[in-house]
Amino acid sequence: SMSQLPRLGDQDHWLATKEQTVKVRVGEIDQTAHSTNISSWDKTKSSRPFIRGVHFTEDEVGNVYIRHPAFRKDIPSRANERQLAMWSGKSDVQSYGPRLACQAIVNAHQERRLRWAVIPRGCILGNSVNHIEMNQPILNRLTEAKGDLQQALEWMCKQLNRRDLDDWAKAWSANNNVNNYELEMLPLQLGIETSVEEAVN
């Protein structure tokens, strides 16, 4: 049963190293405190996409994707996704590589609780988004398993978006806030644990 599986944030999870377990963090920018630095999308070379919970959406078959004007041409000019979609503050906010992130606030009408997506390098996350923090040895381990970090993250994202995991999260959820502790407690068996260990030994 799922309750027997290792939890994402466990010390004995396949992704954990001696130094660090997988941590889930809230997005680096507090949207209220930095409201003057967040503006509507305006494409220039230096524009940095600002990703909020509202940018996580699903297609008609339930695949999660990021609906943000930096990556899609089909967003109407007055759409909510265009507002507060660009970081216009100081550029010294740390730039992260690609990472896995999840909507932190669930809308009443959405069927899924968990909406995970791979966020491209250089994007800035608001605090309506949670993301998985992995140190370099963990990222290296994922890369070795799948040959390429981007592919590894997309593959892991598929696992995190699985229906049974979403059902589990719904069964245990207290409210419409998806917090980092809840995500670290997700039972996640990645399914490559044995094959990779054999390859390493």
What are these regions (language model features)?
Residues S1-V200:
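Polybasic, glycine- and aromatic-enriched phosphate-binding surface used to engage nucleic acids
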